[in-house]
Design a protein with these regions (language model features):
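Conserved, well-structured core segments that form the ligand-binding/active-site neighborhood
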Residues: 75, 205, 209, 316
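Helix-loop-helix junctions within the multi-pass membrane cores of secondary transporters/permeases
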Residues: 2-35, 39, 60, 80-139, ...
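Helix-coil boundary and interhelical linker segments in multi-pass alpha-helical membrane proteins
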Residues: 41-52, 91-102, 241-244, 344, ...
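Loop-to-helix transition at the N-terminal end of transmembrane alpha-helices
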Residues: 47-66
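Helix-loop-helix hairpins and the membrane-proximal interhelical loops
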Residues: 1-52, 166-167, 198-282, 423-427
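Membrane-embedded alpha-helical modules
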Residues: 96-210, 214, 324-432
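Transmembrane alpha-helix interface/packing and boundary motifs in multi-pass membrane proteins
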Residues: 64-77, 186-192, 250-257, 288-298, ...
Length: 432
């Protein structure tokens, strides 16, 4: 068995061993396990069955991780993506009024398009043709979107008729616990303690139990029935022309998020070859895109590679065996449904705020010297949360980019990809 594992994953060639890979897998799982609490809680607000989406989240993540490990041999964990799950629930279903079945159909279509791009030159064309500042702005804008939801769920900000928003009531135990959860996660992360986010979520949940704010129903149980969301996607409904901007948003946010994560992980895991090419990048992208398709069958928003995988790589993970361990742990997590169900929304608020802040870190790489590049990016970052729509924020960013470039005499610098997306967004605003 040991020799078979060493041969299959090429452990010696990657200067690692079974013990290191198992430890790395456990480390990665601990750092990203918060998704099994956050994702069902968020997706259930779209009308989906909580227990079913809990199991769907675990199964989608398990499939993706096992596929990544066994096919691509990358030490990367995958799960339904943060940000896109919020877009799914609050914008596509909540604001735009589509059913969650149609929204899942859009996830499926975006996944198919992503897969096609990953096996054709379209991927390189699109990655190269979208301005770097706008790619960075997408991630940062989604971060602010997540942070806004976290602040709202924690009661830290509340609606105000006179000023739109105001500070929440910190004499309310749930609001206070949400703030304490964020502080705890931040402190543990700064001290480099693995699993800081999930520790913060569970700590707030435990305090809530002691304060009799919630009822505790146990930790383990047989997995809930997944059939209420299984294969319930409405693909034909998602083919409506009004869904184009939604599909584009799912596609490109996932594409750039995945590309950024994989490029970063490849460097840390020594997967960059002497030629500068990344080893088996095409396989990793195929896994990511096909996992989104599979996840849509289980009621999930687009599945994506997690930057938290870097924690496992720091622990010594170098091969797909790390991802396989993560996948097995996600399968075992299906038995934690009672614990997941008892976690209150304010317990995950701190996690959302913390993840949001991490997503803003990419803004340091913006080109702050060229205002024709900077201003459209900042418009995108600001308008995603303020319009409460990733699709509208991205659209306004591209419209601003092309408009500014045209009128400052830099039309030749506008790439074909930027023109293509801008025309789609113009059509959206005029005809839809």
């Amino acid at each position: 068995m040991k020799l078979a594992l060493e041969k299959f994953f090429a452990l010696k060639a990657h200067n690692t061993n079974i013990q290191k890979e198992i430890l790395a897998g456990i480390t990665t799982f601990i750092t990203m396990a918060y998704i099994i609490f956050v994702n069902p809680q968020m997706m259930a607000q779209s009308g989906m069955d909580y227990g079913a989406i809990f199991v769907g989240t675990c199964l989608a993540a398990a499939f993706a991780c096992l596929f990544m490990g066994l096919y691509a041999n990358w030490p990367v964990g995958l799960a339904p993506g943060m940000g896109l799950n919020a877009f799914f629930t609050y914008t596509v279903v909540g604001e735009m009024g589509y059913s969650w079945e149609i929204a899942l159909g859009a996830v499926f279509i975006a996944g198919i398009l992503f897969f096609i791009m990953s096996i054709t030159p379209l991927r390189r064309w699109m990655l190269d043709s979208i301005p770097l500042n706008l790619r960075i702005a997408m991630g940062a804008g989604v971060g602010l979107f997540i942070g806004f939801i976290g602040l709202k769920n924690g009661g830290i900000i509340v609606a105000n008729g006179a000023t739109f928003l105001s500070l929440g009531d910190f004499t309310n135990p749930s609001t206070l616990l949400a703030g304490l959860g964020f502080l705890l996660i931040s402190i543990l992360s700064i001290r480099k303690i693995p699993g800081a986010i999930i520790i913060g979520i569970l700590a707030v949940t435990l305090m809530s139990i002691f304060l009799n704010l919630i009822e505790f129903d146990g930790i383990f149980a047989l997995p809930p029935d997944v059939t209420p969301v299984l294969m319930e996607l409405d693909i034909l409904g998602a083919l409506d022309v009004t869904m184009i901007s939604v599909i584009v948003s799912f596609l490109f946010v996932n594409l750039f998020d995945t590309a950024g994560t994989l490029f970063g992980v490849a460097t840390r895991a020594n997967l960059v070859e002497e030629s500068g090419d990344i080893k088996d990048l095409d396989k990793a992208l195929k896994v990511d895109s096909s996992s989104s398709v599979f996840g849509s069958f289980l009621g999930c928003a687009p599945v994506t590679s997690y930057v938290e995988s870097s924690a496992g790589i720091e622990a010594g993970g170098r091969t797909g065996m790390t991802a396989v361990v993560v996948g097995i742990l996600f399968l075992l997590a299906t038995f934690l449904s009672p614990l997941a169900a008892v976690v209150p929304a304010y317990a995950t608020a701190g996690a959302l705020i913390y993840v949001a802040i991490l997503m803003l870190s990419g803004m340091e790489s913006l080109n702050w010297d060229d205002q024709s590049e900077l201003l459209p990016a900042l418009i995108m970052v600001v308008m995603i949360p303020l319009t409460f729509s990733i699709a509208n924020g991205i659209a306004l960013g591209f419209l601003a980019y092309v408009s500014i470039k045209v009128f400052v005499g830099e039309i030749s610098k506008i790439s074909s990809g930027a023109w293509f997306l801008t025309l789609i967004f113009v059509a959206k605003f005029i005809f839809l």
